[in-house]
Design a protein with these regions (language model features):
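Histidine-centered active-site/metal-ligand motif
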Residues: 29-31, 109, 113-116, 173, ...
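General structural feature for long, well-ordered alpha-helical segments within catalytic domains
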Residues: 6, 17-24, 37-48, 76, ...
């Protein structure tokens, strides 16, 4: 009988497939696509998965750009999550030190999702290698999850049961630190409010008009007063997406506004949402207009899993990282100058640790404060405080134990959703971070496959955290994914 392979040998598959994986990442960067419009990116990833021996299934949950690649059979079943959508208006030349759009107004990968999807494929390839060469029972599934940016694709997929058979899941995100992501996130709802009025000549017969634009402005004013009377941690954002027209001498008959409501728990978001709805109805009543709302999407808060986070931290610390060249360090320094210089905000990191550990962590981080690339591992954080953002990974974390890391793919201090981040998306720094993330995720999965008791411990922790009620999808039945910025 042939001998099996070790975890370290399985992880070599990430290095072996570096060429195809990096090429796929660059192809996705070259043709950026926004939420639920990622048809080229889907084709690139499905092609890669099929070449690597995965069974590809498309149109998951009825979403054209949601798909999976499966290898193996039986239990345990592990999910590896990948994203690939871009952000509107962030077109940028690769590895440029100046803000220079490739195509004015076109999208760009300002959150590194070209790397995120392919890095997760790399992890799936290594896990497949481990299962195959060891003749082990088990299933690894790569999930292509569209529309994370403003679309909450995973939330729709979770609502429709796509992740129900998973025993656990892992994912990652590009960033400027090597760190296990610890803590919760903000749940959110996104809604469009539309107002319908009556047009008239604004000077000759204004009394005949019913201004939909006035309704939007009154709604926004009402919400402004509401902010004082909601919990401190909540946030209400808005964008007027249609003012009705460009003619001030016309009473505007139509106007719409997009709202994003955030809070630490789904129940808190829902309560604020109902109050915002009342304000919208009141604005319509005051202006003699009609109001209709369209529920666009929602996502749940993240559920921490310390069992998995500790395993992921172990792999983060043990797996070797590629050193950076002098050329890479110089490029990171130069691009850092475009946003005020590279640095680690040590105080921002320290708030995530218990008081008894702060001094030791500060002593560890201090020598790295001015590093141009953060070539170190952040110690495992203690806090379970809520992060100041939202992610649809939250919905997966309610369904099965889930853990994620951030890996260095950019110069220290690079702002997210910036031209500088887009510029670095095809760099060798980015490729090295993507490969490292793939190994850390695969190593975490293999550790859990080798010790099934860890899977049970992680599941037990999840049950304790979510309670008897379990996962209640925040997106109502019948709501379908919506592309906010469709292709023109």
């Amino acid at each position: 009988m042939a001998m099996g392979i070790t975890k370290a040998e399985a992880l070599k598959a990430v290095d072996r497939e570096r060429g195809p994986v990096c090429e796929a990442s660059d192809r996705i960067w070259d043709q950026p696509e926004t939420a639920f419009q990622e048809f080229h990116s889907t084709d690139v990833l499905c092609e890669l998965l099929e070449k690597e021996g995965f069974r590809v299934e498309r149109n998951l949950a009825g979403i054209a750009t949601a798909f999976s690649g499966t290898y193996g059979s039986g239990k345990p079943v592990v999910g590896i999550l990948g994203e690939f959508d871009a952000l509107s208006g962030l077109s940028q030349e690769s590895e440029s030190l100046e803000k220079t759009a490739l195509v004015d107004g076109a999208p760009g990968h300002g959150c590194g999702h070209n790397l995120l999807g392919t890095g997760s494929v790399a992890a799936a390839i290594a896990v497949k290698e481990y299962l195959e060469k060891n003749g082990k029972e088990g299933t690894v599934i790569f999930f292509g999850c569209p529309g994370e940016e403003g679309g909450s694709g995973k939330s729709f997929m979770a609502r429709d049961g796509v992740f129900d058979n998973l025993d656990f899941a892992v994912t990652w995100h590009p960033g400027d630190k090597n760190v296990v992501s610890v803590g919760s996130s903000l749940a959110n709802y996104q809604i469009i409010y539309r107002f319908y009025g009556q047009a008239s000549h604004a000077a000759a017969c204004p009394e005949l008009g019913r201004s939909a634009l006035d309704a939007v402005e009154l709604m926004n004013t009402g919400v402004q007063y509401l902010r004082e009377h909601i919990i401190q941690e909540a946030r209400i954002h808005y964008a007027i997406t249609n003012t009705g027209g460009y003619s001030p001498n016309v009473v505007q008959p139509y106007s719409e506004v997009l709202y994003l409501i955030r809070a630490p728990k789904n129940s808190q978001v829902k309560e604020i949402y109902e109050r915002v709805n009342d304000i919208a109805r009141g604005a319509a009543l005051m202006t003699g207009t009609k109001m209709e709302l369209q529920f666009v999407k929602a996502c749940s808060n993240l559920v921490d899993n310390t069992v998995m986070e500790e395993i992921m931290q172990k792999n983060l610390e043990e797996i070797e990282r590629e050193p950076y060249t002098a050329e890479e360090i110089e490029f990171a320094r130069k691009i850092g100058e475009t946003f005020g210089g590279n640095h680690v905000d040590i105080q921002d990191v320290l708030v995530r640790y218990e008081k008894s550990r702060k001094a030791a962590v500060e002593q560890f981080l201090a020598p790295h404060a001015d590093d141009v690339i953060n070539d170190f591992i952040v110690p495992l954080m203690d806090t379970e405080e809520c992060l100041k953002g939202s992610t649809d990974v939250g919905d997966v974390s309610w369904v099965c134990p889930t853990a994620q890391i951030n890996a260095v793919t950019e110069a220290a201090g690079t702002p997210g959703h910036s031209w500088q981040m887009v510029s670095q998306g095809k760099s060798s720094i980015a490729h090295k971070g993507m490969q490292f993330a793939g190994k850390v995720m695969a190593g975490t999965v293999i550790d859990m496959l080798e010790k099934p008791e860890l899977i049970e411990e992680a599941k037990k922790e999840l049950r304790r955290r979510v309670g008897a009620e379990g996962y209640i999808p925040p997106i109502p039945e019948g709501i379908r994914p919506m592309a906010i910025n469709p292709k023109k």
